[in-house]
Amino acid sequence: FRFETTVVLPGETTLLRQYGRTLAPCIRLTPTYAEAYRRLMLEAYSAHPEAFTSSVAEREALPLSWWQQRLTTDPSAHEVIFGAISQGVLVGAVGLGQETREKARHKATLFGMFVQADHQHAGLGHLLVEAALEHAHTRPGLRQVLLTVTEGNTRAHALYTRCGFETFGVEPDAVKVGASFVSKIHMWRRLDGGVARATA
């Protein structure tokens, strides 16, 4: 499945980085990307079950309409999904979800981070986090972004640290995978004045 064009919503920032011999744009995904996003995330849940709270079976059972709704462009949507496109193919994604409860609307969570194995080590993860942080800066009242990373995933932890996140705790046995349990490191980043941008 390949995309002939890249869709960019009005007012959305498109970040470009040199990726091999092609440009890898990072865009906000729309409902037209639902099938590709579903396929990408099912691959993620299958390849790295310890990294996600949802299982591949749970997500595979959901109708396409659920994935389309997750990619809604409604201005009132509390979740946005960004995707990395390489040569017309969706190869990575990350989500940002803002709390809807009155006392917690100053917080958002980075979730669903995944880049296909063949496209790792090329800076796409950094690009996706940067896109999410730039969007977070545009959200009224949003002050901080939270995330969790599997304990022992040193590469992901290093990426988030480079992007300005700090560890504030560890949740023991946060996710059960088969007969084993894995712990989650909790990280956060405050959105201070100026553009919230990942550091080099």
Regions found by a protein language model. Give the residues of each.
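Short hydrophobic/aromatic beta-strand or adjacent loop that forms the aromatic wall/cage
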Residues: 79, 182-186
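Conserved glycine-rich acetyl-CoA-binding loop
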Residues: 103, 112, 116-130, 139, ...
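Acetyl-CoA-dependent GNAT
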Residues: 31-32, 38-39, 44-112, 116-118, ...
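Conserved catalytic-core motifs of GNAT/GCN5-like acyltransferases
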Residues: 146-149, 161, 166-182
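Conserved N-terminal entry element of GNAT/NAT acetyltransferase domains
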Residues: 8-32, 39, 43, 185, ...
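Aromatic (phenylalanine/tyrosine) cluster motif
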Residues: 1-3, 19
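Conserved GNAT acetyl-CoA-binding A-motif
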Residues: 136-148
